[in-house]
Regions:
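Polybasic, proline/glycine-rich intrinsically disordered low-complexity segments
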Residues: 138-151
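A SIS-like phosphosugar-recognition module
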Residues: 55, 123-124
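TerminUS-proximal long segments
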Residues: 157-170
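Short acidic/histidine-rich active-site segments
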Residues: 117-121
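Alpha/beta enzyme core
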Residues: 1-116, 129-130, 134, 140, ...
Length: 198
């Protein structure tokens, strides 16, 4: 990987992209330092990959660090750190703090120039669709959509709440009005349901 990065930078690339098997700042920094021995101003793009189990990786990193420091970790089973029973533990809170600071730590300590997540909307769309389906077809019924989606769009000022505008119905109305004048049957207008959103 390091040789490929150096070769790419020597042949016109302005940034490098590396992949690691886990999100570990020390490992990433070690790779970047080796590249910078040859290309001192190398810029790294790092994929904060959804392929990583971030929770498990950081819980294991904290477990290992605490163990190396001589801290008592006997209440934790390293092979089972994803267990919900650990979610409110000191180890889990420390791991979450490390996840929260990963971008800043990676930039400072590993020389990451740009962080990205590949396919984040694939995961957010799947999760939100699954949650909506459970609510809508479950006990909440239509309230599952209203409280879980529409009301949040309104409160957060998300333009998609006016989906008719977002899908271009106003553009279609402009064309209809151009060709039919006042007789145009438009999707918008004072009776349009979208006007309920202000």
């Amino acid at each position: 990987c390091v040789l490929d990065c150096v070769t790419s930078l020597q042949n016109g690339a302005d940034m490098i992209w590396i992949e690691t098997e886990k999100p570990h700042v020390g490992q990433i920094g070690g790779m970047v330092n080796r590249v910078r021995e040859v290309i001192p101003n190398a810029k790294l793009v790092y994929n904060n990959s959804p392929s990583f189990n971030w929770t498990l990786n950081f819980r294991q990193q904290v477990f290992d660090a605490w163990s190396d420091e001589g801290k008592d970790v006997s209440v934790y089973d390293r092979a089972n750190l994803m267990s919900v029973e650990y979610d409110d533990s000191d180890l889990a809170r420390t791991a979450d703090e490390k996840i929260q600071s990963f971008q800043a730590d990676g930039s400072r300590e590993a020389g990451i120039f740009h962080h990205l997540i590949t396919l984040p909307t694939y995961h957010t769309a799947a999760l939100s669709t699954d949650n909506l389906a459970k609510e809508y077809f479950g006990e909440a019924g239509m309230l599952g959509y209203v409280s879980g989606v529409q009301r949040k769009e309104i409160r957060q000022g998300i333009a998609c709440v006016k989906h008719q505008n977002m899908s271009g119905s106003d553009i279609g109305d402009d064309h209809k009005e151009y060709f039919s004048g006042d007789r145009a049957l438009k999707a918008a207008g004072e009776d349009n349901t979208m006007n309920q959103f202000g």
